[in-house]
Amino acid sequence: MSVITRFAPSPTGFLHIGGARTALFNWLYAKHTGGKMLLRIEDTDRERSTEAAVRAIIDGLHWMGLSYDGSPISQFERAERHRQIAEQLVENGKAYYCYASPEELAEMREKARAEGRPPRYDGRWRNRDHSEAPQGIKPVIRIKAPEDGETIVHDRVQGDVRFPNKDLDDFIILRSDGSPTYMHAVVVDDHDMGVTHIIRGDDHLTNAARQTIIFKAMGWDIPVMAHIPLIHGENGAKLSKRHGALGVDAYRTMGYLPAALRNYLVRLGWSHGDDELMSLQDMISWFDIEDINKGAARFDLKKLDSINGHYMRMSNDQELFDAALDILPETDGGTEIIERLDEQRRVQFLKAIPHLKERSKTLCELIDNASFIFTQRPLQLNEKAQMLLDKNGRTILNDLYLALKACPSWDTKALDETLRSYIQTQNLKFGSIAQPLRAALTGCTTSPGVLDVLILLGRDESLYRINDQLITTVGL
């Protein structure tokens, strides 16, 4: 049997981080078994479903590197098929028309509330003849759920989960306007798509019991089910925006790499021994739904930062350069950088990446650490950098300006000899000259090594920047 999984999001917003992990698990299991992953858009809620959300979901999957087989399937466009199966269930005696009025249903709920039990439909139309139907009321179709015993969901993650049938009642599968309920549409679609494995969040477990009843009523094979634990925040509570419940597009804009996000998400609820960093091929080779944990996973942004930093350091410089430019329009200050990004600065930025990526955990940090390349003269020094250019710092800076101006050639060897000659003459340590020099060249107290910065900026720009600070500080 060829494995077919499916990712079935509702297009009511972005591809959130929990959905991305569900898609990843489905994709990995399909790849692990040599099967397929299909994409179904569950767009039956016409008021909340939008084309923009569909696009965001597909874009998010593509960015994550999670390809699906075939074309996306619209659940809404299959409404006629859902209706046909509901009618077939009635014909087979597995479902029935219910003409209970809204007033009757409200009365049932009120009675249940008064008796201290959950509201349940009382089955009053289950065995009544269709000829007794009242005038002017459009019926719904309800499934004939088992009245006693229990429905068992055989789950690869949760084990056997048992549901007393008395708690499930005769739920609606087709509304009075002819539209299918989610519960019914999902079963019909999974069957028609040939889905063999359903991998989704464990908040769908109760749905699984009701869907099992529909599968059995139709005499269809029930897919293997694996209900994975939800992702919680660092505080153990339900994941909120404050604790990471953002869309994949937000993580992209925050400067995370798709490979790093995949690596982080795969370990939320699944692991392979103590392996923390793993290649995509390793994930495909090792992943199995049998190894998914039952307990909720906690989202740890610091851990994601650490993993992303690793992938930054391991990435090709050109790829990082391209990825950084790609997110610039969506980052704070990115528009200004784009306006200043002439060919010379593009070359400087690319050359700086080997040094910048060693101290950057995200692309945004990489861009921020490269800000000295994009800034305009005269540089605005941050507070710490200003403190370095005190009287002693200015004296050193003035001496360095004269020494560098006289440097015979602007290469690493000549610049290093010039700086070390000054250090020996003045009996100083390298750090004591590097700090004021870095402040003047970058406006910051952290940057690549000062020799690297001097080479990146070139002779003219370096000397102009140093002189700017000497002119500024003289006037203080």
From Swiss-Prot:
Keywords: Aminoacyl-tRNA synthetase, ATP-binding, Cytoplasm, Ligase, Nucleotide-binding, Protein biosynthesis. Its EC number is 6.1.1.17. It comes from the Bacteria. It catalyses: tRNA(Glu) + L-glutamate + ATP = L-glutamyl-tRNA(Glu) + AMP + diphosphate. A motif ('HIGH' region) lies at residues 9-19. GO terms for biological process: glutamyl-tRNA aminoacylation. It is found in: Cytoplasm. A motif ('KMSKS' region) lies at residues 238-242. ATP binds at residue 241. GO terms for cellular component: cytosol. Belongs to the class-I aminoacyl-tRNA synthetase family. Glutamate--tRNA ligase type 1 subfamily. Catalyzes the attachment of glutamate to tRNA(Glu) in a two-step reaction: glutamate is first activated by ATP to form Glu-AMP and then transferred to the acceptor end of tRNA(Glu). This is Glutamate--tRNA ligase 1. It comes from Bartonella tribocorum (strain CIP 105476 / IBS 506). The lineage of its organism: Bacteria, Pseudomonadati, Pseudomonadota, Alphaproteobacteria, Hyphomicrobiales.
